Amino acid sequence: MVVTAVIPLTAKKVKVEFDHQFTLVLYKGELNLFHLKEGAQVPDELITEIENKILKKRAVKYAMHLLQKKDYTVKELTDKLLHAGYSDSCAEHALEYVASYGYVNDKYYAVRYLETYSDRKSIKKMQMDLRQKGISDEMITQALEEAEMENEQDTLRCFAEKKARSLDLSQEKDRQKLLRFLVGRGFSYTDAKNVTDELVIVHNER
């Protein structure tokens, strides 16, 4: 491979581009160590050595650093590693390492997420959130069976009552506003309409 570009990233780091496509993020001192400069011919064996001896360990360290701050799904952590400039193989190595110790576990993440947010989000909204985080439908279904969640109707009622405090339910436009708010949070139209009607009755009885 040929070094086609050396791009400064920070005061200490650079991105080294090979053949206009493959890149590695290295410290500036490592450029001299491995004799990397624009136009240099680099054997594939050297790139493999850099990845195996330096970058894979560095990727593991970075992944551990991220996980000390918060939990991540496999997709989220992979995206973080790739965004930081690690190659697919380095990211895969880091994921395998942290997963082997149970530091990243999509099933556990999904259960925790459902239990944490069930008092403020609908099941539909939480399912959408988890899909965006890269968790499969099958795993979400398993998590729903295992998680100890708040009753969704109670969550809906709590949402509706809180929102209704800022509305005048004697006005049709405010009733529609409440209904749209609840549906927008992922609750079904039927359930949202029922609880809205119940709150209107309570409001009229005052």
Regions found by a protein language model. Give the residues of each.
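An alpha-helical, amphipathic repeat domain used for nucleic-acid recognition
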Residues: 1-206
